[in-house]
Amino acid sequence: LCRAFLDGDAEKIQKHLTQILGRMISILDTKARDEQKENFYHGLLLGLLRSERDWLIRSNVESGDGFCDILTEPEDPDAGMIIELKYAATFLELDGACEKAMQQIRDRRYDEALRNDGRENILAYGIAFCKKRCKVVCEKL
């Protein structure tokens, strides 16, 4: 999973996350108000990314004009990743939620903290979750 993030392979990330969600979680795990459901997926993804011990992984980092969900600095001093998560109420809303996440990354300039650290090879991820499914999009900033 971590290799797929580093490679910018949104399709592989989506496949791995969907398998993990299907095998590990219960729909009851996200039993909360819609505006709080994202928190469960945020914590789950932080735990999964932590398996890469040499990465600096930070949550809710102030960058640009806001706070990005997850900011990751891999071993490569030029590389960085921004991950913005969204919860979609229905499966049909997954694509739109991903685009909303990506637009938020661009509009709020979440890449600023990484660029200030001298990182220029930055990947942005918009990930939307709905129950045991997800959609992942990636672009190079």
What is the role of each PLM region?
Residues 1-109, 134-141:
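Extended alpha-helical interface modules used as scaffolds for assembling large macromolecular complexes
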Residues 113, 117-141:
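Domain-level recognition of nuclease-like catalytic cores that cleave nucleotide substrates
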